Curated annotation (Swiss-Prot):
It catalyses: cytidine(1402) in 16S rRNA + S-adenosyl-L-methionine = N(4)-methylcytidine(1402) in 16S rRNA + S-adenosyl-L-homocysteine + H(+). Its main location: cytoplasm. Its EC number is 2.1.1.199. The lineage of its organism: Bacteria, Pseudomonadati, Pseudomonadota, Gammaproteobacteria, Alteromonadales. Belongs to the methyltransferase superfamily. RsmH family. GO terms for biological process: rRNA base methylation. This is Ribosomal RNA small subunit methyltransferase H. It holds the Pfam family Methyltransf_5. It is an enzyme of class 2 (transferase). S-adenosyl-L-methionine binds at G37, G38, H39, D57, F82, D104, Q111. One of its GO terms (cellular component) is cytoplasm. The keyword tRNA-binding does not apply.
Length: 313
């Protein structure tokens, strides 16, 4: 099996993230998606001797990669998804004391590039797709038993694939005779099922995305993680979230907007502005930030990234 450190990962919107977090030398920060530690390394560079960085990741290979920071007493990592952030930070006695939370969503380059992880339709490997390979159901196991209607819904809803019904039907027809266990096998089934090809995207792009999001409960994790971030952040603490597709970005944008609203009251009710504002949790900072043309030229995978930043009130 190919080792994870053979795959290079370039952190996206790196300088923009560090600026967004407005790092205090002695602050306490969370890298909610450690990956291969690119953002963590730069946060540590910005921290002073008394600063602290707590990282989260559910990928065992990411936990292994974090060993490079083992000698830095300011750093610690928790092998859990960021959906567990509220409970883990409460256990450390740090709820309401975190100065910044960074979330870099989606799949990392090492996960995509390692065929054995089963995320890529361009590299043949076991059809796995789990962020944490030590638990949960693989994509192959789910596709072997899922109802056609459920497969359709997942591919349409999470993959935003208009040919979801055709693809699901092809999957169910194929598995009657042959187990679907390889990424190349699934990609071929999808390719043959999609009647109209997008010249800018591989036919399997959206379906693979949808299945991956479902297998890892990514959107539910994001909802829980965003709420957890507001719970652990100190007043004026920063939340910075990088998303890579419209489902994630819409969810993040809506969350920040909803948390920035005050109390909703009838128009003629005698209530002060202070009482209305009391329910506000976050304040959006600036507009969505996208990578520069230079960054996209250096790292094509950054092209769809969007950074949104908010501050705890």
């Amino acid at each position: 099996m190919t080792q994870p450190n053979e795959f290079k990962h370039i952190s996206v919107l790196l300088d923009e993230c560090i600026e967004a977090l407005a790092i205090k030398p002695n602050g306490i920060y969370i890298d909610a998606t450690f990956g291969r530690g690119g953002h963590s390394a730069h946060i540590l560079d910005a921290l002073g001797e008394k600063g602290r960085l707590i990282a989260f990741d559910r990928d065992p290979q990411a936990i292994k990669a974090a060993e490079r920071f083992a000698d830095d007493k300011r750093f610690s990592i928790i092998h859990s998804p960021f959906g567990d952030m509220a409970e883990e930070i409460e256990a450390l006695g740090l709820t309401g004391k975190i100065d910044g939370v960074l979330m870099d969503l989606g799949v990392s380059s090492p996960q995509l590039d390692d065929a054995e992880r089963g995320f890529s339709f361009l590299r043949d490997g076991p059809l796995d797709m789990r962020m944490d390979t030590s638990r949960g159901q693989s994509a192959a196991d789910w596709l072997a038993s899922a109802e056609e209607q459920d497969i359709t819904q997942v591919i349409k809803e999470f993959g935003e694939e208009k040919f979801g019904k055709r693809i699901a039907h092809a999957i169910v027809n194929t598995r009657k005779d042959t187990p679907i266990t390889r990424t190349a096998q699934l990609a071929k089934i999808i390719d043959e099922a999609v009647p109209v090809k997008d010249k800018f995207k591989h036919p399997a792009t959206r379906a693979f995305q949808g299945i991956r999001i479902y297998i890892n409960a990514e959107l539910e994790q994001l909802r829980v993680g965003l709420k957890a971030a507001t719970q652990v952040l100190a007043k004026e603490g920063r939340l910075a979230v990088i998303s890579f597709h419209s489902l994630e970005d819409r969810l993040v944008k809506r969350f920040i907007k909803d948390q920035s609203k005050g109390k909703v009251v009838p128009h003629n009710l005698p209530i002060t502005q202070a009482e209305i504002d009391a329910d506000k949790v976050l304040k959006a900072l600036g507009k969505a930030i996208k990578p520069s043309e230079q960054e996209i030229a250096n790292n094509v995978r950054s092209r769809s990234s969007v950074l949104r930043v908010a501050e705890k009130l």
